[in-house]
Amino acid sequence: MNTVRQKQTVKPNYAFVDAQNLHLGAKEAGLELDYRRFRVYLKEKYRVGKAYLFIGFMPANRDLYEDLQENGFILKFKPVIVPNDGRKPKGDVDADVAFSIMRYYKEYDKAVIVTSDGDFDTVVKYLNKKDKLAAVISPNRAKCSALLKIAAKDKMQYLEDLYGKVSKRKAMQGENEKAPPGDETQGSAFS
């Protein structure tokens, strides 16, 4: 009896990155993130084949977007709303991130979610229950939602713990931190 064994293909893991949360969280933690090294880390540590980065679109930041794409991120843009009342520009991506996590659910083995936002606790609980969560990486331990920590359980990781692997340097307290390339405008693409 001839039995043909089909070669099992292992699905890649996918990363879903809340860019504003990552940028501001790293900055507040005193870290200057190296996006190229961060993308390599995601690939080597978590077998991330596709890394979706959700970001507000501002035409002035085209160079930044090109750099991020060259570093291996797949950009998912959200229009940025610029209020007339002096508030910072805003490009809310939370719903887009959660939707994409579920949209691509059958394509990936496990998800890596990069955020500190408690709004993701429901999707993180669900992924954990279904054994589809590789990790939640919080950009800032001090600002990480307690709900997110509870939902992620033992799969919680903090950007500060990756110092030297994914950050160029640790900014000194009070030191002016240089904005990412193309992010010198009043509003940031990460807003």
Language model segments and positions:
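Terminal and domain-boundary accessory regions
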Residues: 1-191
